[in-house]
A protein has these predicted regions:
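Glycine-rich phosphate/diphosphate-binding loop of Rossmann-like nucleotide-binding domains
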Residues: 16-20, 103-183
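Short glycine/serine/threonine-rich phosphate/pyrophosphate-binding segments
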Residues: 74, 97-102, 126-135, 197-200
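General beta-strand structural signal in soluble alpha/beta enzymes
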Residues: 39, 65-68, 89-92, 123, ...
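A glycine-rich, Thr/Ser-enriched phosphate-binding loop motif common to dinucleotide/cofactor-binding enzymes
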Residues: 91-107
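A short, aliphatic-rich alpha-helical micro-motif
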Residues: 58, 116, 183-184, 204-207
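A structured beta-alpha segment of the ubiquitous adenosine-cofactor-binding alpha/beta core
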Residues: 48, 167-204
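N-terminal ligand-binding/catalytic initiation module
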Residues: 1-89
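Conserved small/polar residues in nucleotide/adenosyl-binding loops
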Residues: 208-217
Length: 217
């Protein structure tokens, strides 16, 4: 179920335009898990109205999968529905992306011979997917002090006013980094979950490199 306010790669395109994406996700549920899923598009950007709509139709279903709802509203919607419904509620942009991303990270670290508690991580993006992925990284052992998160204004620092709760969680006390280029220098991991074409070839060269030519290939 969606209101089409944050469709991947397209942004706020509205409920109707988001229908093909929901149909595709419903098909994946059936093909890979034999779960009968129905795509529902709700023309409601108001949080209260969206929550009440989902609650009203919930008796028909065994579970709710929230999809493509913009932050920070998506966090409140998920939390309220989990509290007020007696069926499973999942937000795919948060939990689905986080699980897949974390699996990839763990495999990459194993190949590179690195430990998650030691790597420096740069996260470009601070929406639902980015914050959920990074929280799961922390749960798996990554250290918050080794993480830099950026939004459209640059590195999220603890002295910045009017931060949302999700951004406060990952705000850094460092004052020596402001841009993506500065943040990425010497980092081990880059997670890109914002707009495309922001990571340049020069920035890739700033990432941590092993002294072994074999490891660099």
């Amino acid at each position: 179920i969606t209101n089409g306010t944050a469709v991947l790669g397209l942004g706020n395109i509205g409920a109707l335009a988001g229908k093909p994406v929901m149909e595709g996700k419903s098909m994946l549920f059936k093909v890979f898990a034999d779960i009968d899923a129905f795509d529902i598009e709700v023309d409601a950007t108001d949080t209260d109205r969206f929550v009440e709509t989902v609650k009203a139709i919930a008796p028909t279903f065994g579970g709710i999968n929230l999809e493509d709802i913009k932050a920070p509203e998506c966090f409140e919607i998920e939390n309220r529905l989990k509290e007020e419904l007696d069926i499973p509620v999942m937000h795919d942009d948060q939990h689905g992306t986080a699980i897949i991303s974390s699996a990839g990270l763990l495999n990459a670290l194993e190949v590179a011979g690195k430990k998650i508690e030691n790597v420096r991580i740069v996260v470009n993006g601070a929406g639902a997917s980015a914050t959920s992925c990074t929280k799961l990284y922390v749960a798996l052992g990554a250290r918050k002090e080794n993480i830099l998160m950026l939004d459209s204004k640059g590195v999220i620092t603890s002295d910045r006013p009017n931060l949302t709760e999700s951004k406060k969680f990952f705000a850094t006390d460092r004052r020596d980094v402001h841009t993506l280029e500065e943040a990425i220098k010497g980092a081990d991991v880059f997670l890109g979950l914002s707009k495309g074409n922001v990571l340049t070839q020069d920035m890739v060269c700033l990432l941590y490199t092993s002294p072994s030519p074999r490891d660099r290939t």
